[in-house]
Amino acid sequence: MNSFRRIGVSLLSITSLAFSVAAQTATVAGRIDTVPPRSVIELPFAFQSGTLTLPGTLTMPASYSSRLPVALIVAGSGPTDRNGNSAGPLRAQNNSNLYAILAWQLADAGIASVRYDKRALGENLQKINLAQTSIDDFIADVIAGARKLAADQRFSKLVLIGHSEGAELVLQAANRGAPAAGIVMLSGAGRPIMAVLREQLSKQLPPEELVKWDSASARYLRGEDAGDVHPGLKPLLLPVNRRFMQTWAKYDPATEIARAKVPVLIVQGAHDLQIGEADARALQAAQPAAKLVVIPAANHVFRAASDDRMAQARLYTDPTIPVVPELTPAIADWIKRLK
């Protein structure tokens, strides 16, 4: 039972189902966890999306002489802040600082970036109706941020970088007209979210509990009471998150990437226990023009890892552990080659 509870917590990190619970007690965790290098400068950057103002951070090289490429970094699921860390109670499960570190390294490579706090964090949480929030709202936020950056004369071209759920958001945003020269999908699923979630559960639940999950999740998505399900899975089926999950579940990333009109870079860690290499290869199969980079040692937050689930836990919580050295050069080189 104890091991199941630990697994249940890890499952929350791959879906946005948890954002309504954790965000209720969250404050914006947009502060830098570690000091950025002197080679970069950071400035506040905010943009409007509908009635909301989404706060973020602009990171640039401390010295530059011409217009820079710029990336909009889009966070993964749950109450994940601009730096890649979970807010509220889930902070103990995810404090990798991935997006801040990526931004600093991109700046050192001559690429500016903006990372932002999603709409379910901080003051904006009080301005939205969680029960009416859909994945399309998050896609609209990406488009709004992209349009502001594309109009900024400091920048030469815009790339969208999304991690985990954010990979699907940037793909959808580009397909809906976000003015991007290309998109980067980090640890992005290649199947509908419910298929990904079921696969994870199948590795961790006894068969009888998996059967209950299948029935309960189907009822949940139909708008009915989920009914009998293991207590550790109930946070995944909260009524307040139903609309979000209904709208997310209808999208298939493989179908969406096949429609992509801009270049795509897919980056995947071979030791990612949340999104497998098969997902990355499914994305490339659906869009053969996409470039795929598999980093052999990397996990979901791009730290060197084994396949041991418990050993990986520390890699999510210690921001001082270095990001794998292959990550940023793969992204930066690809961006610089884009026309």
Place the predicted regions along the sequence by residue.
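N-terminal cap/lid segment of alpha/beta-hydrolase-fold proteins
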Residues: 28-66
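Short alpha-helix in the alpha/beta-hydrolase fold that links the catalytic acid
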Residues: 262, 275-285
